A protein has these predicted regions:
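Short, ordered loop/turn segments at secondary-structure junctions
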Residues: 18-22, 120-123, 138, 172-173
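Internal gly/pro-rich beta-alpha loop/helix module
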Residues: 1-79
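Short acidic, glycine/serine/threonine-rich loops at helix termini
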Residues: 1-3, 25-31, 102-104, 179-180, ...
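Cysteine-nucleophile active-site neighborhood
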Residues: 140-221
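Phosphate-binding active sites in nucleotide-utilizing proteins
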Residues: 79-80, 87-151, 155-160
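C-terminal and late-domain segments of enzyme folds
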Residues: 82-85, 97-116, 201-204, 208-229
Length: 229
């Protein structure tokens, strides 16, 4: 029926993907589970390819895609750098912090940064020659006990950030910098303590959408009292 409706509307059906238990992927708050957590992930992809070869007109999809107009754009500002020296950026990366953005990392490298990865779970300290540190997202609440027990890393995080070097923390990384983080077991674990507060799991979805904030001091991405959305 869907095909007939599409044809009546002048839309050419390109295919479909049937419901298939072998293609099911578990989800979690914030999205799907990581590829490294899925058993037989490669086999699922192979099965998906086999299914789509039978139910999707791949040649028609490619032909249609080639008719799309080229997107013309200009960057609003070319940041660039005149610095001849190398800047070392330490990025948290492990089971707890797995939401990394390749484009951002490539941008940093193209602008004179040397990327150094460290694990808040397994390593004892942030690389000593770091000029800046980034804590991106992930699921620290799933590893709250392990993160809390790594006292030497927490001490290093406090020392480095208190020294005044640039630090960016978002999502799970932002939670890690709080005084306490509620784990998936419902217990509250001591964290880095940079931010005086507790990060807890709400019982329902809080909100999506934009917020307006007014910075009370200058920062890397803001000016004091200049509203942001």
């Amino acid at each position: 029926y869907a095909k007939e409706c599409a044809l009546k509307l002048g839309v050419q059906p390109l295919g479909y993907i049937p419901s298939d238990s072998l293609l099911h992927i578990e989800s979690r708050h914030l999205g799907l589970v990581g590829a490294d957590e899925i058993k037989s992930f490669d086999e699922k992809l192979e099965h998906l390819a086999d299914v789509m070869e039978k139910t999707v007109d791949i040649d028609a999809v490619i032909k249609l895609a080639k008719t799309a107009e080229k997107i013309e754009y200009e960057a609003e500002k070319d940041v660039g750098t005149d610095s001849k020296s190398c800047v070392n950026i330490a990025i948290a990366k492990d089971e707890a912090f797995c939401f990394l953005y390749d484009d951002n990392i490539a941008f940093l490298e193209e602008n004179g940064c040397r990327i150094m990865y460290f694990s808040p779970i397994h390593d004892s300290e942030i690389p000593h020659d770091a000029d800046g540190v980034i804590f991106w997202g992930g699921y620290p609440e799933r590893y709250a006990k392990e993160l809390s027990e790594n006292k030497s890393m927490i001490k290093s995080v406090k020392k480095v950030i208190d020294s005044g070097i640039a630090c960016i923390a978002e999502c799970g990384g932002f939670l890690y910098l709080h005084s306490y983080l509620e784990g998936t077991d419902g217990k509250k674990y001591p964290m880095a303590g940079i931010i005086d507060g507790e990060a807890v799991n709400g019982k329902r979805l809080q909100r999506f959408g934009y917020m307006e904030v007014t910075p009370v001091s200058d920062g890397m991405a803001c000016k004091c009292m200049q509203p942001l959305k």
